[in-house]
Amino acid sequence: MKTILFISFLLAINCGVPGGYRLVWSDEFNGGAIDQGKWGYDIGGGGWGNNEFEYYTSRWENAYVSGGFLHIKAIKESYQGKDYTSARLLTKGKFEFQYGYAEARISVPRGRGIWPAFWMLGRNIDQVSWPACGEIDIMEAINTENKVYATCHWQSNGGHAQYGKESGNFDITQFHTYSLYWDSSYIRVSVDNGQIYEMLIKDGTGNTGAFHNKFFFILNVAVGGNWPGFDVDPNQFPNEMLVDYIRVYQP
């Protein structure tokens, strides 16, 4: 059962780091390796609830830091019974936060069947499962589209509720800043300081209480699946997402 929440959608509103907020966590990816104190890995090839094609690894071939960027690379190769490998990094158990302003500067890959994402899950996912834990998708892109999607998922009346919006068209392969403003009343998502999404969560309206807990980050590049489809172009690989930085600010 899907519940639709009343929301408002705004375009081209200037955003950015709110006044009085200070930097509380960041990764600039300027070292020679992924910071294990900040990032862990999801590993496996079970489809991740979406019938994805890839096997996520912790190998250097799929995720590494070089040239001031985090590289998450999807590769066509036979590995653990799968035809593709990639990486899914997360801050679960290392950095989790409630409310604030977060931004990441990212170059997003395009290609038929590719599915890069910068997103968040509630820290209590192991206790309450999904979607009760809540999910905030700051940036998702699929296939060869030149646009991105922002979506929230949660549980309402025993079922899955969601609300999403898409951006206008732009060259997602260039670096852009994807940001989240999140307080006790609203979730807002922007691209290059132009707001594309707003959802009201004040007082848990629409059964959105999950969004008043701590969340952690996830960065990944999936291959195939229920949303992008199963007609993957094998000639695009290797294909990678580059992340310049991630920063979190709070009052």
In which residue ranges do the predicted regions lie?
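Sec-dependent N-terminal signal peptides
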Residues: 3-12
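GH16 jelly-roll
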Residues: 15-251
